[in-house]
């Protein structure tokens, strides 16, 4: 069942039904198609994979809303193309919903993957800090396999790494800029 945050649904759903955030589905579709998307309400994308394909350019405006995501390779936002993150209203956030738990929850909330992948952060907050940050911290943005990341505005708060970059012995030209 696709539901907006304003929807009135029973507290328990019949077997076989699942409540899915309509805003999360709209976000997923918009990022896959490229262009500009402005969040209309908070969205929980846990269990969903939001991807910007290699041949697409997308802009995500948090518009003062919150995206809740998991730090797993199968969740969160993965950029293979180009993403600009901004927040036109202020107080917009992307937040981690789980503590670090080894490899299962050990990726960035946003992952930039590949030589031609790039992200520019112009505003908003990526919040991956947890209550026990020293032992159960998380990662904000992960840059892999030659991806590029530029931050010109906003902030990243993380328990361990705000921006994480790892190579895998291939020729890579990752660039991380803080402007």
Question: Where on the chain are the PLM-derived regions?
Answer:
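Acidic Gly/Asp/Thr-rich repetitive segments characteristic of extracellular carbohydrate-active
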Residues: 2-51
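Short, exposed beta-strand/loop patches in secreted or surface proteins that constitute
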Residues: 28-31, 87, 149
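Alpha-helix C-terminal capping segments
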Residues: 9-13, 27-31, 67, 135, ...
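Beta-strand-rich solenoid/repeat architectures in extracellular/passenger domains
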Residues: 63-73, 88-106, 122-137, 152-164, ...
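Extracellular beta-strand-rich solenoid/capping regions of secreted or surface-exposed proteins
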Residues: 45-59, 68-87, 96-119, 133, ...
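Solenoid scaffold repeats with emphasis on beta-solenoid/beta-helix
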Residues: 7, 37, 43, 50, ...
């Amino acid at each position: 069942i696709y539901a907006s945050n304003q929807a009135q649904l029973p507290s328990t759903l019949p077997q076989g039904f699942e409540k899915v955030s309509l805003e999360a589905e709209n976000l997923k579709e918009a990022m896959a198609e490229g262009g500009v998307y402005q969040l209309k309400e908070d969205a929980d994308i846990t269990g969903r994979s939001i991807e910007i394909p290699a041949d697409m350019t997308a802009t995500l405006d948090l518009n003062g809303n919150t995206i809740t995501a998991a730090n797993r390779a199968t969740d969160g936002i993965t950029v293979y193309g180009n993403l600009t993150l901004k927040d036109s209203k202020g107080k917009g956030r992307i937040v981690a919903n789980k503590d670090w738990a080894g490899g299962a929850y050990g990726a960035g909330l946003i992952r930039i993957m590949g030589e031609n992948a790039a992200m520019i952060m112009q505003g908003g907050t990526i919040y991956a800090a947890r209550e026990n940050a020293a032992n159960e911290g998380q990662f904000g943005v992960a840059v892999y396999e030659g991806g590029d990341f530029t931050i010109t505005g906003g902030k990243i708060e993380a328990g361990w790494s705000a921006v994480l970059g790892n190579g895998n012995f291939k020729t890579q030209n990752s660039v991380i800029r803080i402007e």
